[in-house]
Amino acid sequence: MVFVPHAVRGEEIDLRITKVMKTSCAGEIVKIHNPSPERMEPECPYAGKCGGCAYRHLTYPEELWAKRQRVQDALTRIGGLELTVEEILGAKNPEHYRNKSQYPVGADGSIGFFQARTHKVVPIRRCLIQTEAADRTAQAVGEWMRRYKISAYDETTGKGLCLLYTSPSPRDRG
């Protein structure tokens, strides 16, 4: 089995193997020959840089299918269980639906999300899947840190004061 981030089912692609593991491989897309009708251009200006939204290149129904399939595969392949995962009930609005917001603060004081598979912070002002209130809170904390010269936590040194976490919103998620 080869895991290829950002590939969409049904596509014909050229890929490069980037990592070989015991029972699988990881790869990256080199060229897409036949894009899936379920592939779309992400509206997010941070897509491809930020690791916070791995499915924004998919239509929303395909995103729900991919998430369900990921759980089904993990239960079957890793867990050895023969269970059927039910269909995912999607959000009423596929934007600003995330009910847990966690914004890391970079050593330079930038606030955003980690770049995929790294702990490098990609500065972000507005996220399409976080609540607008969470975005405003993150920006306010960033301004507060700059104003009062509050140091960000640096995981390499273990020093610093701030790693931002915004709790869930109480509003109905549908």
Predicted regions and their residues:
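Single conserved hydrophobic/aromatic residue that forms the stacking wall/gate
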Residues: 168-174
